[in-house]
Amino acid sequence: MRMSKAIAAALILVAPGFLSIASAQSASECPVAGILSSFGINSTGLFNVPPGGTCLFPLRIEGVIADSSILQRPAYGVLRQLNTSTFEYTANPGYAGPDTFSVQVTGKGPTTTGTSIITLVATVR
C-alpha cells in the first residue's frame, strides 16, 4: 500500500513539531550528594545546575511513599511536583548563586515509618 503525497507532506510538516515538543519537555536527573534513604529521617542534598537549567529529583526511598509535598519553594527558581515521587527544579535564567528548597515525604519502609523533610541546596553556576 502506497502513501499518498498529501499524507506524506502532512507528516513531514507535523513530525518536527512533535519532536521539538518532546525534547523541550525532557529534563535530566541531576546528581545529588547526600540524599534521604529512610523514612522518618530528615536530610540535605547538594547539587549543581546551570542558570536556566532543569533537574529532575526522583525520591529513591526503599518502601512505599504515601504522600509528598513541597514544603519550601526556591527563591531563585521554580519547583514543580510531577507526581508523588518526582520533583522538577528549574533555576532562573541569569541567576548565579545558592538556592534552597524543601520537600516533605511520608511513607513506610522495611525498617522505619514516618515523615521526612528533604532540603535541597542548589549551586546555580
Please report, for each region that a protein language model flagged, where it lies by residue.
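Short N-terminal segments immediately surrounding and downstream of signal-peptide cleavage
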Residues: 24-46
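Bacterial N-terminal signal peptides that target proteins for export
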Residues: 1-9
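Surface-exposed or secretory-pathway low-complexity segments enriched in glycine-proline
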Residues: 47-85
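C-terminal segment of classical bacterial N-terminal signal peptides
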Residues: 14-23
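A short beta-strand micro-motif common to beta-rich folds, especially ectodomain repeats
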Residues: 96-109
